[in-house]
Amino acid sequence: GFGSLFKFLAKKVAKTVAKQAAKQGAKYIANKQME
């Protein structure tokens, strides 16, 4: 039903957000190391 579809989408979004956050975090750490 609708609930399972919503859960599926939420999982996908969470994964994408986590990936983006990891990228941003790595960039931030790299910049800090450069200083």
Curated annotation (Swiss-Prot):
Official protein name in the record: Cupiennin-1b
Superkingdom, taxonomy of origin: Eukaryota
Reported tissue expression: Expressed by the venom gland.
GO molecular function, one term: toxin activity
Organism: Cupiennius salei
Function: Has antimicrobial activity against E.coli, E.faecalis, P.aeruginosa, and S.aureus. Has insecticidal and hemolytic activities. Probably acts by disturbing membrane function with its amphipathic structure.
Similarity comment: Belongs to the cationic peptide 04 (cupiennin) family. 01 subfamily.
Modification type Glutamic acid 1-amide: residues: 35
One GO process term, biological-process aspect: killing of cells of another organism
UniProt entry keywords in alphabetical sequence: Amidation, Antibiotic, Antimicrobial, Cytolysis, Hemolysis, Neurotoxin, Secreted, Toxin
GO cellular component, one term: extracellular region
Keyword Zinc: no
Residues annotated as signal peptide: none
Localization of this protein: Secreted
InterPro entries: Cupiennin
